[in-house]
Structures are given as structure tokens and as C-alpha cells.
Swiss-Prot record:
Residues 28-100 form the Collagen-like domain. This is Pulmonary surfactant-associated protein A. GO terms for molecular function: carbohydrate binding; metal ion binding. Glycans are attached at N20, N207. GO terms for biological process: respiratory gaseous exchange by respiratory system. Ca(2+) binds at E215, R217, N234. The lineage of its organism: Eukaryota, Metazoa, Chordata, Craniata, Vertebrata.
Amino acid sequence: MWLRCLALALTLLMVSGIENNTKDVCVGNPGIPGTPGSHGLPGRDGRDGVKGDPGPPGPLGPPGGMPGHPGPNGMTGAPGVAGERGEKGEPGERGPPGLPASLDEELQTTLHDLRHQILQTMGVLSLHESLLVVGRKVFSSNAQSINFNDIQELCAGAGGQIAAPMSPEENEAVASIVKKYNTYAYLGLVESPDSGDFQYMDGAPVNYTNWYPGEPRGRGKEQCVEMYTDGQWNNKNCLQYRLAICEF
């Protein structure tokens, strides 16, 4: 026992560098632990830790209350592609008969006003002698001098045809236009390629003539008819420039 104490003392002396005043130190065995002390006071709260990651979503909750009211209508969408045409339906029932035209007051009023306007227009144009009314015919000229074929196209484009007098009254009306412009005019008659006689443009035979004495002559060469300023007729080739007079 004393040897152990001596070794410890020498070691302590060498470490501390102290040569004298050494003390004998002896370490004993650990004693029996004492009884635990009473619990101390609670410590203070620590600092807040770092925010953790979000947790997983919770389970689906139960349905809510009653559905809300429908929202307002949205904007109209673009029209879709047209579908195929359906089958033709059955004819509908026949409607009740309408009133006779003579009893339709509105129609009669419209016709009366239209007739009045037409007569007014004709009257105004007649003052300029560019339009003359004889019976159910209307003769008109635009003062142009062109060949026979061009006159045909001009009159047809206006809805009429080359003037062709069929009575002394009609011939006098056409002659008054010829006198006004002081130039000859072609009439709506042509020589038949078969008989050589003159006929109307639709092929019907002529029922009225006012030939200049000794006319017509030059069969086969002069296949059109012109009117002099005195209203008499003469056959002529169709390539001359003559006053265009149309009838409607």
C-alpha cells in the first residue's frame, strides 16, 4: 500500500517541478452515492426553432352545404359549322284565297300613283321631243348616229327595239324625231333573204309602208330601210351611220 502512495507522490513531484515540500497523497475507493436531490425549478423556454417543412395534405373533408345559385350566362360562342341540309318537308296547307286585285285598295293606289309618275315622266321628256308616245308605243332617241347593228344592240340593251312604224300615226311620230335632228334614221325592217320582200325584225310581214316613189330598189344590196326627214322610206345598205330611234 505504501509503495503505491510513494509512486503517486513521485509522479506528482516530477510533473509540477517541485523538489521539496512533498505531501503524501493517497486516493481511496469511491464512496456510496448519496440520495438524489429534490427537483429544481423549471428552466426558461428555449428559442423558437427553424420552420419545418409542410406536412402532407389531410384527408378530404365532408361535403359542404347546399349548392349555390347558378352564375350568369357566359358570352355567346362562335357559330359552329353548318350541318347538312335536311330533307325537303311536306307541302303546307293551302292558305285562304286573297282578295281580287280590283278589290285590293292598296294595290290599286300603288298602281295609280305609278301610272301617274310614268305619265309625268313621259310628258316632261315629250317637251324635249326625245320621247313620243303613240298609243301603246313609246319612241325615243339619244341623238346618236351609228350603223344598223349598233342601233340594234343599243335598243335591245335599253329593253326595246329599232323603231318600226305600223301606222300613219306612228310614222308621223318617228318622222318628227328625224326632223328634229335633221338626219335620216334606220327603221326596224330588213329584206328577207328568201323572198326579197321586207319584213319586221321578228320575221313578220310588213303591214304598213310609206315608200318614196320608185322604192324599194337594189334588191340584195340594200337590205335595210331608212326614213327621210319628210317621213318617206328608202331601202339602204346597213353600214351607213343613221339616227338611232328605239321603240318600247
